[in-house]
Structure formats: structure tokens, C-alpha cells
């Protein structure tokens, strides 16, 4: 009975560690999705305004 209980505790502990790893991974993924990447001055820009400041439509570059 003691051996069975110990085995169950080990399995539960292992599952708990895996769950914590997945939670940490999901947290990192959310953070990277919230981090916006923008183009700096002089870089080309298009329909999606991906400039840090403003996209000059005539030149199609970031200002």
C-alpha cells in the first residue's frame, strides 16, 4: 500500500511540473504577441502601418 501511494505521489508531482512548464510557455507566448515590432525611420512601409511613427504614403517610408 505504501509503494502504491508513493508511485501516485510521484506521478502527481511530475504532472504538476509539466503543467507549470506549459503555463510558463503560454505566458511567454502572450508576452511576445503583445510586444509590437515597428519599422524605424526610412524603412519601407505599406498598407499596414508598421512604422514606429508615421508612414509617408507618397514615399512609402517611415518618417
Curated annotation (Swiss-Prot):
InterPro entries: Conotoxin. It comes from Conus bullatus. It is found in: Secreted. This is Conotoxin Bu9. Keywords: Disulfide bond, Ion channel impairing toxin, Knottin, Neurotoxin, Secreted, Signal, Toxin. Residues 14-37 form a propeptide. Residues 1-13 form the signal peptide. The presence of a 'disulfide through disulfide knot' structurally defines this protein as a knottin.
